[in-house]
Amino acid sequence: MPQAPMPEFSSSVKLKYVKLGYQYLVNHFLSFLLIPIMAIVAVELLRMGPEEILNVWNSLQFDLVQVLCSSFFVIFISTVYFMSKPRTIYLVDYSCYKPPVTCRVPFATFMEHSRLILKDKPKSVEFQMRILERSGLGEETCLPPAIHYIPPTPTMDAARSEAQMVIFEAMDDLFKKTGLKPKDVDILIVNCSLFSPTPSLSAMVINKYKLRSNIKSFNLSGMGCSAGLISVDLARDLLQVHPNSNAIIVSTEIITPNYYQGNERAMLLPNCLFRMGAAAIHMSNRRSDRWRAKYKLSHLVRTHRGADDKSFYCVYEQEDKEGHVGINLSKDLMAIAGEALKANITTIGPLVLPASEQLLFLTSLIGRKIFNPKWKPYIPDFKLAFEHFCIHAGGRAVIDELQKNLQLSGEHVEASRMTLHRFGNTSSSSLWYELSYIESKGRMRRGDRVWQIAFGSGFKCNSAVWKCNRTIKTPKDGPWSDCIDRYPVFIPEVVKL
């Protein structure tokens, strides 16, 4: 199914998104204003010396009213500053689920199952083969046990078993890494788009680990592949108002109940791309975690295009003519993703780009709007703002188009391509497999900036910016531990099956 290419980033940027980005800066204007003033005063006091300061003090004449007014003013300004200053949000550590080898689905196995399940639909089998050949996936991606049966057995029990397997293993590893005890978890957020049982997945986690009765728990569903960053945004907001707290985020997609067994081509695409995976993330606002945390959250920008009908329906769960439920992916998906991306990065640009890049971009944008629409648009160099890029591994076409539009090198998108090859599209958890890849390659240094970009149904585009808090040693375990030496690998345009 041919898809419209993603439009060039700066061909139709709207000024309202630029304005939105600068509104973020204005909201923190007081902090930006007071910090240099305080620094100048401190430097001047250090320059004067104690005797000169004492002489100045003695030369001043104060009365009680002046002292009270001055004290009140200082206290008022200090209070306003510290109340308006947001808490620092840390990413202490995270863990990614590593599927067992028994769940692997080589191309030959996938196609054999497709031929048996769709034995009366040879054209649908051929279509899946063409998609798989060009998907960018490798031979080691995994599907849950229920999908290995012929025919598949997508029962509620099987779906719960998959959820328990991926979520509990990721959380067990996270607790082991961080030393965090279940009783110390204050906030729990679980996001899974297509599987929403009763009791919820968050309740399942609470029951398993016997978490506190006053825990603040949330279960997000139906929010697509970008739900992981929505969970980060929710955790950030909660940590801003609840001091000295620990938050756990679980991002996953349960494949078992969502494996499409019908014949509609647009609904067969997810079968070829989506694979099992999960990630558990520990976030905190405790000052005691500042020394051991891996990252600090700098910015998070969310863009929702749901008001537009095409955007709303481009990723849509529905029944086909035979009653089989599946996800319909529109041929306009790439174009819609491009529009969401433009809005998102135009908003985040003023927050992260150097002043020189902002000036060039704004000059180009205003010139095109006022003087000549045919002027060649200036594409900001986001490589000056970030050292690492984690682009949602939704498919080969998504990565190709973002690399082209953002003018990124092969190394910048390496983590995304290799994650797609090794694990497939693991939905909302893919960003964390990509971050783990960068760490496993030993590339993460203190001060490095990471840009995570995710797309999701609705249609949404979300961005998170992290700053590395300390140089990260190459991990000895994790999802890449047994294969990182083989990567990066060459991925041909077409793999003949």
Curated annotation (Swiss-Prot):
Q: Could you tell me what induces this protein?
A: Repressed by herbicides such as flufenacet and benfuresate. Up-regulated by osmotic stress and abscisic acid and down-regulated by darkness. Down-regulated by low temperature and up-regulated by salt and drought.
Please report the name of this protein according to its UniProt entry. 3-ketoacyl-CoA synthase 6
Question: Which SUPFAM superfamilies does the protein's record reference?
Answer: Thiolase-like
- Catalytic residue list: C225, H304, H388, H392, H421, N425
Sequence intervals crossing the membrane: 25-45, 64-84
Q: What happens when the gene is disrupted?
A: Plants have no wax crystals and are male sterile.
Task: State its Enzyme Commission number(s).
Answer: 2.3.1.199
- Where does the record place it? Endoplasmic reticulum membrane
Does the record bear Transmembrane in its keywords?
yes
Q: How is its activity regulated?
A: Strongly inhibited by metazachlor and mefluidide.
Keywords on record: Acyltransferase, Endoplasmic reticulum, Membrane, Transferase, Transmembrane, Transmembrane helix
Origin organism lineage: Eukaryota, Viridiplantae, Streptophyta, Embryophyta, Tracheophyta
Gene this protein is translated from = CUT1
Q: Which Pfam families does this UniProt record tie to the protein?
A: ACP_syn_III_C, FAE1_CUT1_RppA
Q: Where is the FAE domain?
A: 81-370
